[in-house]
Amino acid sequence: MANPHQIYRHDAAWDRQVFRSLATSLILHGHIKTTLDRAKRLRSVVEKLITKAKKNDLAARRQILSFLYGQKTKAGIKVMPYLFNKVAPRYQERNGGYTRIVRIPSRLGDNSKMAIIELV
């Protein structure tokens, strides 16, 4: 498993921004295609966010709001209400393991290992 504290080639701000964006997209769309290393690191980020969302108190809302982007989809769905009203209730009986990583063939351009990460 990838080291969660490892920073790729960039600084910590770049690293945080990439995983904020990936986590927001995963919550909104349910699955995304990315590199295998990013998927492994994203798994721990998203699972912590969903665990906090299951608490459904003010402190959890503020912590998640400070991390996720407040964007909407084309259908007008906002991230925060969707996470607290649709995603978190699905996992009330589950104590972790909210995501699944499925390996797919390598990318043609640079032969990077690719994966699809999805909410179970």
Curated annotation (Swiss-Prot):
**Keywords, sorted A to Z:** Ribonucleoprotein, Ribosomal protein
* One Pfam family cited in the UniProt record for this chain: Ribosomal_L17
Molecular function terms from GO: structural constituent of ribosome
**One GO cellular component term:** cytosolic large ribosomal subunit
GO biological process terms, alphabetically, are: translation
Q: How does it assemble?
A: Part of the 50S ribosomal subunit. Contacts protein L32.
Write out the similarity annotation: Belongs to the bacterial ribosomal protein bL17 family.
Which protein is depicted?
Large ribosomal subunit protein bL17
Q: Which organism is it from?
A: Mesomycoplasma hyopneumoniae (strain 7448)
